[in-house]
From Swiss-Prot:
Coiled coil segments of this chain: none
A molecular function (GO) term: heptaprenylglyceryl phosphate synthase activity
CDD domains per the UniProt record, alphabetical: PcrB_like
Protein name according to UniProt: Heptaprenylglyceryl phosphate synthase
Function: Prenyltransferase that catalyzes in vivo the transfer of the heptaprenyl moiety of heptaprenyl pyrophosphate (HepPP; 35 carbon atoms) to the C3 hydroxyl of sn-glycerol-1-phosphate (G1P), producing heptaprenylglyceryl phosphate (HepGP). This reaction is an ether-bond-formation step in the biosynthesis of archaea-type G1P-based membrane lipids found in Bacillales.
This protein's encoding gene: pcrB
Keyword Lipid biosynthesis found: yes
Amino acid sequence: MTDMNKWRHIFKLDPAKPISDEDLMKICTSDTDAIMIGGTDDITEENVAHLMHKVKCYSLPIVLEISNLESVVPGFDLYFIPTVLNSRDVKYHNGLLLEALKSYGTLIDFNEVVFEGYVVLNPDCKVAKLTQADTMIDDEDIEAYAQMINDMYQLPVMYIEYSGVYGETNLVKAAADMLTETQLFYGGGISNYEEAEMMASIADTIIVGNIIYEDINKALKTVKVKETH
């Protein structure tokens, strides 16, 4: 099984967004720990498979973060299933997992499945609107979510998602301080090395996504956080 406990940096690629072969090569040979493929809109079996096959030319772990069952294809090292704990809609807590088990329960290799405890904190992002997430969260709330994930559900990953904006470091640190076993992922708004360095000093693993499509050189510089963390 792929060991993700040592991952400090992940590049997240959206299969619905175009990326040149040259930029993809730079991303995949950058010394990042893994490539995550995932997104919210227009995620299909075809574009997921197309991007996966391109990434698999390089020797690094590749993960699919599942947003719908129709886009799930074989060949990934790990499959991440989000449960959005601050969603007001129960289907985003366990609905995706329920449908996966109903459709593929006897075929799933559970050694390849990672259940992520998601907390979405940017009210304006697509995933917050889609999941009807309650983003009005203070330190006490995030600490309680962290305890829920670490101590009660005992999930391997807590993912704090700001999706497009840079997050509040005090909230990320409040969560980090409560986690003893669960790995803390942070994603959202990292657009330069300094922001990456700050979040890497708090979270176990940082996820860098949008900046790949805006400024590839700034994206590549974020990998340097591995030298100090």
